[in-house]
Amino acid sequence: MSQKGKGSCPRPQQVPRLLVKGGIEVLDVKSGPDSITTIEAYLQPRPGQKNGYSTVITVQAEGYQDAPHSTEVPCYSCARIPLPTINDDITCPTLLMWEAVSVKTEVVGVSSILNMHSGAFRAFNGYGGGFTICGPRIHFFSVGGEPLDLQACMQNSKTVYPAPLIGPGEGERRETAQVLDTGYKARLDKDGLYPIECWCPDPAKNENTRYYGNLTGGPETPPVLAFTNTTTTILLDENGVGPLCKGDGLFLSAADVAGTYVDQRGRQYWRGLPRYFSIQLRKRNVRNPYPVSGLLNSLFNDLMPRMTGQSMQGSDAQVEEVRVYEGMEGLAPEIDMPPKAPR
């Protein structure tokens, strides 16, 4: 409901006041403890090649000889977005940490699947249009304060993944890799190197990460993909706490394989699509987990999680836009009106 101002004129509805908007450099702007930061970024797919496709999918006659090429195995995408340091004194009993509150995300390029004229295998005895992308597909994403924890579970424990891909274990692999063997775990710390087919999110860990996914199988399953900018996923747990960004870093990962493309010779190629993220963060007061003695040790020990991910800094940064909100102001009739200068 609108509020009454002077006389009979209604007051505008109060909404968060936009403090500043821009690229990754906006994160350097100092903001108050009650400010809200929104980061827009995207992750490119890693189906095998950087063009969004894999090379031809090969099949071995015997499982014990399975050794796929590195360019035909879809892998997880991941990145770390650096956040500004918000604590001037880390010896205090309490600290401020970035907390991921909500995310809007969608797969980009869904409409490209309608292409039926670019050399695909033709329907109706070679007289119809080309088959669109179809078959097995997976859609997955995660948002966390540290890298995603992974648990191995393979279809064939004899599969050998060539370098630089990272498969479960080293050397001779146990057959228990085909079920849940807790000896085969990892962290998603490198972009495009962890095969989706043998690594899944670890349900026993990931307390500081929220992940979501679904898979549809079948050799010719038609793709069913929805896209909208109105769906928000809340990242808070049952205690009202979202992922806390350790080391002032926000970690994103994705796996979006829309199916396979079939050429006119019947050869199949995986097709990957990029994913867009819009994450809202706030500042959360937490108990200082680092005693003074630990701070001294940290001079010699790297305590912060690291990741070799997609570019989120520099000229090739995949951060689309950053918004910082602080305080409240009257609702404007135009969404894109320039923000008021900070007082």
Curated annotation (Swiss-Prot):
Quaternary structure note: Homomultimer; disulfide-linked. The virus capsid is composed of 72 icosahedral units, each one composed of five disulfide-linked copies of VP1. Interacts with minor capsid proteins VP2 and VP3.
GO biological process: endocytosis involved in viral entry into host cell; virion attachment to host cell
Domain-related comment: The N-terminal region contains a nuclear signal but the presence of VP2 and VP3 proteins is required for efficient nuclear transport.
Pfam family, one: Polyoma_coat
InterPro entries associated with the record: Capsid_VP1_Polyomavir, dsDNA_vir_gr_I_capsid, Polyomavir_VP1_sf
GO molecular function: structural molecule activity
Superkingdom of the source species: Viruses
Similarity remark: Belongs to the polyomaviruses coat protein VP1 family.
Species the sequence originates in: Budgerigar fledgling disease virus
The keyword Disulfide bond is assigned to this record: yes
Subcellular location: Virion; Host nucleus
GO cellular component terms, semicolon-separated: host cell nucleus; T=7 icosahedral viral capsid
Keyword Cell inner membrane: no
Function: Forms an icosahedral capsid with a T=7 symmetry and a 46-48 nm diameter. The capsid is composed of 72 pentamers linked to each other by disulfide bonds and associated with VP2 or VP3 proteins. Interacts with sialic acids on the cell surface to provide virion attachment to target cell. Once attached, the virion is internalized by endocytosis and traffics to the endoplasmic reticulum. Inside the endoplasmic reticulum, the protein folding machinery isomerizes VP1 interpentamer disulfide bonds, thereby triggering initial uncoating.
Keywords carried by this UniProt record: Capsid protein, Disulfide bond, Host nucleus, Host-virus interaction, Late protein, T=7 icosahedral capsid protein, Viral attachment to host cell, Viral penetration into host cytoplasm, Virion, Virus endocytosis by host, Virus entry into host cell
Protein name, entry field: Major capsid protein VP1
